């Protein structure tokens, strides 16, 4: 769990974790990422607990904090928790029961989105086997720890969680969802989702896509039809984020780079998904205006 400037939430988050009632033993690895507020002071009351370890480091961002924690894995499975969120009662028990019963590489639980005392929505899943098309959010899941044996979160980028969507989920052979609602997600107006709007750093969404496609090659991972469809979704997400930058020149450059990526990695692939065909056709035809229209149409139909 990365900790940075969360003095308002850290106690609620930690209490929700250490109070989990479960037959499964677990270790809470907290990485104080150079937090300048009172977060570290508030963590002191947990230092004596046998299943809590606190690591202090200079600030390296969310990715750097998670990578530090991953180097200290001792268990068979790992879970990521953001320190302004919290676990639901019974989360560890429900996720781990499913993981062990079905020998899963990843188990995804449901989540509740909230702000203050108000619930904004809830995402629920069936008890079922799943494929690797889960959205690339790190929380609300347990992962087999060995999935991160050769993989880490890219540091220095926004949207570093894309590594899950484009690499980690692809490494998993068995994924299941559970109907248990495991996670409370706080809608944070200070997070990247909101602060990225209009910020040139939004371009990281494109940069990290190229970086991760290169990393896939280094890991010996080939291209597949399923990955191609995910890639098209990723291009949509990239443009959705970057459109907040008020520069047509930037948009056109991103379109051209997207064409190059598709040509480099997926030249001979074609999608069978109706919702992605207009986007694909614009990349093949080099029509930026049609690309813009395709992105706008997807915006209303794809989460």
Where would I find each of the regions flagged by the language model?
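Nucleotide-sugar donor-binding/catalytic module of glycosyltransferases
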Residues: 1-211, 218
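Membrane-interface aromatic/basic loop that binds lipid-linked glycans or pyrophosphate carriers
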Residues: 245-303
């Amino acid at each position: 769990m990365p900790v940075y400037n969360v003095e308002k939430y850290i106690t609620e988050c930690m209490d929700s974790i250490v109070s989990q009632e479960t037959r499964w033993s677990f270790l809470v690895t907290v990485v104080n990422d150079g937090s300048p507020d009172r977060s570290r002071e508030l963590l002191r009351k947990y230092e004596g607990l046998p299943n809590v370890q606190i690591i202090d480091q200079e600030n390296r961002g969310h990715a750097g904090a998670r990578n530090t924690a991953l180097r200290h894995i001792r268990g068979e499975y790992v879970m990521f928790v953001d320190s302004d969120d919290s676990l639901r009662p019974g989360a560890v028990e429900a996720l781990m029961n499913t993981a062990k019963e079905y020998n899963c590489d990843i188990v995804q639980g449901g989540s509740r989105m909230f702000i203050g005392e108000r619930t904004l929505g809830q995402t629920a899943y069936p008890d079922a086997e799943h494929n690797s098309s889960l959205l690339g959010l790190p929380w609300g899941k347990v992962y087999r720890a060995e999935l991160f044996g050769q993989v880490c979160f890219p540091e220095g980028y926004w949207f570093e969680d894309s590594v899950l969507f484009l690499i980690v989920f692809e490494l998993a052979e068995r994924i299941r969802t559970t109907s248990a609602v495991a996670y409370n997600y706080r809608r944070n107006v200070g997070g990247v989702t909101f602060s990225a709007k209009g910020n040139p750093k939004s371009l990281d969404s494109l940069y990290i896509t190229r970086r991760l496609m290169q990393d896939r090659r280094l890991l010996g991972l080939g291209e597949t039809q399923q990955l191609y469809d995910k890639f098209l979704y990723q291009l949509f997400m990239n443009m959705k984020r970057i459109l907040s930058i008020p520069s047509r020149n930037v948009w056109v450059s991103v379109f051209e780079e997207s064409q190059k990526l598709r040509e480099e990695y997926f030249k001979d692939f074609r999608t069978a998904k109706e919702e992605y065909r207009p986007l694909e056709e614009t990349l093949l035809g080099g029509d930026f205006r049609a690309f813009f229209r395709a992105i706008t149409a997807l915006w209303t139909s794809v989460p």
